[in-house]
Amino acid sequence: RGSKNNMNKPSVTISTNLSAQRVSRKFERQNIYSQGNSITAGYDPTSSMTWGPKISELANDPKYGGNMNNQYTATDGMHEGQYYNPKRAQAGLSGWTTPQIYDNVGDFLGTGFTENTNVNLSQSINGINYSFGVNNSHQNGIIPSTGMDRWGARGLVDWKINPQWNTGFSINYSSTKITSAPGANDGIMNVVYSAPAEYDLKGIPNHEPGNPTNQILFRSTSFTNPYWWAEHNEYLQHTNRAFGNTYLEYQPNLGLGENFSLKIREQAGLDIWTSDYATIREMGSTSSLLSLIHI
């Protein structure tokens, strides 16, 4: 029948963790004044500033208000309580809309999701301890189209050959793919944070009807609409890594009692990795006039 150690059975462990993430607190921003350089200058749907007239008074704006005589009411008739936004008309919607406040930050930032799964097999038998496992992590970021996927494998073996000799090895491998959001001049979060409170960043289509290469945004076209970016562009980082070590240990019997011992150990290890990066900008990206695939 053998010893008890010989009868140890393999142990299989499976674990999964799931979690969700939301932005717990957003910074306060003014939602009184509309897009424009100043109150006296009036509403300006091309301005990068949000110090125009009060949102509640947009219907009375001399140039765009539906309560006023201007080029838009001359064409479409009076629109009491509304104002005209040329960006809506460019997107194929009615240019006339009722002033209201939108949560552009909350609309853009979604719910993140994280999943971690581990499967492990281990056993101790005849002086050999081993453990092998695989794991997976998947994450969807709170910023649309961002996330991570990682697969990994691990092996560990320790072998007590006899009272004097021990050997073993460990090896780890991982493959990680990360899709991230751009920063600096190509950043999208600065566009989300700076969106005028009365501009429906989510609801207004991000490109002209039938022409996805012509973006629509509340400010100049040198900035990318974050929803357009999430649909068309990608920043990818892929890393493969392997590392581990092996050892051989000798402990001679010196016959000097338990308080004295000598161990001689030789060990070698490795750590290798490769990383590749891909930047994909489709035709219509504002940072370049042409589409770009950079690897």
Residue ranges and their predicted role:
Residues 142-152, 172-174, 178-182, 240-241, ...:
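Small-side-chain secondary-structure face that scaffolds active or pore-lining regions
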Residues 127-130, 164-167, 255-256:
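Repeated loop/turn-to-beta-strand initiation elements of outer-membrane beta-barrel proteins
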Residues 97-98, 180-243:
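Acidic/polar loop-and-plug regions of large Gram-negative outer-membrane beta-barrel proteins
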Residues 4-144, 182-185, 231-236, 247-251, ...:
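Residues embedded in well-ordered regular secondary structure
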Residues 153-158:
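Feature captures outer-membrane beta-barrel proteins of Gram-negative bacteria and organelles
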Residues 15-17, 133-135, 170-172, 265-269:
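Transmembrane beta-strands of outer-membrane beta-barrel proteins
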